[in-house]
């Protein structure tokens, strides 16, 4: 139940089970920044045609100070991927499926039996940050720029150059528009919305995606957790629930740790930025795993 990237990517990988996807939305295809690791992309099991760009470097700035990160990241064209995946499975848009139990749903007054997997997305409850992203004409760069500001507590801004456009945005609490970097290019479009910032939640039965609040606390990225749960859910459907339960425990431990780190950084935001960037200014750090960018930076800022 749910036709976002979580539900559609899972259905794509479970095609031999003949899954049915119910989606409240009119049509699939959400716009997002879509920066993920190569590790995450590999586990989605989709074609490389959905990769718009590859990045080997991130520059993180605070005032006139910089920290460089060696990375291995990809830009996933999530909008096009969702549209294409919806065409290869039984996909029903504009359909509100009410989950009655892990084995039953209610669709337009009719009860349907079967294994229910919740991919219904975030319910809007709990803490959230606001995000806005502007799409401009392309610039000549292959480096992602991340900007931290004293007044944007717990948030950041970004510039992501792609071959055919440039993604420029900001997220944080309150009005984040003033933190969006200026770009001397023609504006093409604007999109955005709220992003959950919460600890992982308990959900009865099988679930995947933002319904679990399994998103990176600092950036709000959730595709990584989708990729990690695809294979464990398959094993659970085949009769072995242990891998799913173990992966949930692992995700919960890491995400809740991230939540605590970010909460600590928010309480001493200005001090953390000044101290951290004074110690790491001009240095280059290597990021090898999915959470390292956040754990590495925030951990060093706080210690």
Task: Please give the residue ranges for each predicted region.
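Short, solvent-exposed loop/turn segments at secondary-structure boundaries
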Residues: 30-34, 72-73, 171, 218-222
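Predominantly flavin-linked oxidoreductase catalytic cores and closely associated redox partners
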Residues: 3, 13, 83-204, 212-215
């Amino acid at each position: 139940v749910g036709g976002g990237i979580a539900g559609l990517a899972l259905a794509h990988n479970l095609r031999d089970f003949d899954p049915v996807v119910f989606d409240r939305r009119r049509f699939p295809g959400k716009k997002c920044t879509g920066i993920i690791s190569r590790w995450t992309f590999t586990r989605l099991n989709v074609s490389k045609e959905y990769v718009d760009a590859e990045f080997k470097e991130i520059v993180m700035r605070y005032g006139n100070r910089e920290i460089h990160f060696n990375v291995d990241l990809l830009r996933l064209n999530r909008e096009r991927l969702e549209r294409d995946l919806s065409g290869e499975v039984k996909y029903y848009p504009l359909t509100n499926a009410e989950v009655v139990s892990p084995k039953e749903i209610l669709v337009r007054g009719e009860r349907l039996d079967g294994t229910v997997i919740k991919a219904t997305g975030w319910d809007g409850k709990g803490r959230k940050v606001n995000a806005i992203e502007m799409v401009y004409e392309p610039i000549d760069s292959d480096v992602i720029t991340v900007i931290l500001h004293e007044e944007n507590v717990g948030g950041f801004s970004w510039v992501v150059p792609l071959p055919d456009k440039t993604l420029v945005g900001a997220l944080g609490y309150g009005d984040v528009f003033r933190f969006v970097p200026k770009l001397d290019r023609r504006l093409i479009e604007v999109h955005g919305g709220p992003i959950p910032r919460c600890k992982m939640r308990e959900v009865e039965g099988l679930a995947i995606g933002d319904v679990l609040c399994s998103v990176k606390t600092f950036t709000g990225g959730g595709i990584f957790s989708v990729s990690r749960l695809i294979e464990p859910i398959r094993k659970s459907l085949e009769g072995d629930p242990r891998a799913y339960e173990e992966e949930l425990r692992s995700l919960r431990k890491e995400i809740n740790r991230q939540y605590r780190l970010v909460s600590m950084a928010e309480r001493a935001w200005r001090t953390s930025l000044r101290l951290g960037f004074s110690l790491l200014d001009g240095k280059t750090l290597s990021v090898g795993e999915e959470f390292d960018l956040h754990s590495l930076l925030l951990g060093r800022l706080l210690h």
